[in-house]
Amino acid sequence: MLNNSIHSLQKRLLAVFVLVAFIFLAIIVRLGYVQLIRGSWLTAKASQQWYRSLPLSAERGVIADCNGNKLALSYSTFDVYVRPNSVQNANEVALILSSKLGLDYDKVYAKIINKKLSEVCIKMQVDEATCNDIISCNLAGVVMSKNNKRYYPYGDLLTQVLGFTTVDNVGQSGLELYYDKYLKGVSGLSLEESDVSGKKIDNTAKKYIPSISGMNLNLTIDVNIQVFLEQALNNLMVEQKPKTCTGIIMNPNTGEIVAMSTKPSYDLNNVPRSDVQTLLDTSRNIGVVDVYEPGSTFKVLTMASAVEAGVAHLSDRFYDPGYRIVDGEKIKCWRLSGHGSQTLTEGLCNSCNAVFVDLALRLGKDRMYDRFKVYGLGETLGIDFMGESGGILMNKSTAKTVDVARMGFGQAVAVSPLQLITAFSSVVNGGKLMQPYFVKSVKDGNGAIMYEKSPNVIRTTISTKTSDIMKTMVEQVVKQYSGFNAFIPGYRVGGKTGTTQKYENGRISGKYIASFVGTFPADNPDYVILILADEPSGSSYYGSVVATPYAKQVIENIIKYKNYPADNLEDDLKLVEKNIRIPNVVGMEINKAVYMLQQLGLFVEIEGEGSEVREQFLPAGEMVSKNSIVILTT
């Protein structure tokens, strides 16, 4: 009996011992877990309760042009915060802050008396002078945190290319958005000990986690040439009154974007954030993201393709009665009476639709679509910019012969301005389709290169032999034909004009896009320039008048800036003397108009039986040689 009691007691003691041992083991395991596994997390949580932090904004990187001129930089500002639990006189603080910061008193007061918040931001990016003024008032509970504000020294220059940032210095559009991860840097913190109510504990040291400045961008843009382009586009907006206009200047040998602009624009230091529609419309980089039917400027690509494929030769002749009939449809040339017999070169210089219908049909649908791919049409080119368009190509399987015929002269196909200038550049640079780009390099604050872009040949489009032929052709267009408004005595300029009808709901709208693509120097181009005006509403809508003269303005400024020497000046001056500027005869009585034009040495063709001139082609203002034909519509 006694033995049984002892045995039972031993079992109970053992159970108690095991239980106590298990509890101690659990405590040890828990302590180990808390100390070793969760220690860092718990320390951080404690720090959050006992430390109050202020952000230290990283300085955003500088954006500079190819010569080091700063296009976007940051300067120091301050964010004003209030710690409600430290405020001694809420009314006084609200009154002073609202007055000096230009804010509503009631809104500031409501923030200050909200004791549930340990800290509240009153206003961001306040200038240093204003902050010093506030500091001098010795307001308890008011603290400042250093920040940065973006500044664009050139105002409305490169509006769509550079883009802008939020007040928090986050890229919102343009290169500021595309390269935001490089530009933004890493923010730091200023930490100070505080009690449970958020008040700073006296005699405690602050801790700092320093910010890391953003990296700097070095662009392909030359700000001087950018100024030339924007001046020309501003002139175009005033004189030709288009809805918008766009310009791109490319180095055809590297793909570097030397200048790019769209008008209208806005000052990047005063972004119209309150007008969302205006902001969206004027922030859109039309040169990269929009598409249009290129019209006659596209004929250069068709011509180069035909010569390269061996289906067209300089010795070929074409007869143009004023139209071609394809699939039962009549495709008219702009000159309704036709150009008659002409050479291949004359076909381009005359911008004769019939010739390019023939060339497109000689190439055929398969080769035409192959050429589109070769030129980078229907796909993006990989430029370092958000929203790049790949253009629009009709589905090959549904394209009819008449569609292919129209593609030959730039209809039934849509491209972005960037695609057109890149493809055009390949025609005059020896046949290399270069990838376009904006940023040459990314460097850290010490100047170390973190990223560097080298010219990239996407593919070969044509042979150097074909390229040489095309360079000569486009120079002839400028010397004696529709591109003469870009002619500069003593300098070799090439180019092709374009006038495109716009369609709305499948019908001709009566609105136009006028364009010009120019090359300089024509024999070995350093620059290819595209000028495009959407819906000009001045005295003309032809590319030769609306776009070409403004490309000439840019080239003339580049000549002075880069000190290009003149050549064959005397011969070119004689050529100018032989040319005539077409007068405006629209609205004149037909007999008077004919007499005026004939007195200038021009031939006249009349379409219609009216007594007054309703429309004329060649357009007023265009420079042409004597014996050129002006078509008057009555």
Question: What are the functions of these language-model segments?
Answer:
Residues 1-272, 291, 366-378, 387, ...:
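Periplasmic/cell-envelope proteins involved in peptidoglycan metabolism and beta-lactam response
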Residues 291, 543, 573-614, 619-634:
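Extracytoplasmic Gram-positive cell-surface binding/anchoring modules and repeats
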Residues 449-455, 545-584:
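Short, gly/Ser/Thr-rich active-site loops of penicillin-recognizing serine hydrolases
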Residues 451-452, 537-541:
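Short small-residue beta-strand/loop micro-motif enriched in glycine and branched aliphatics
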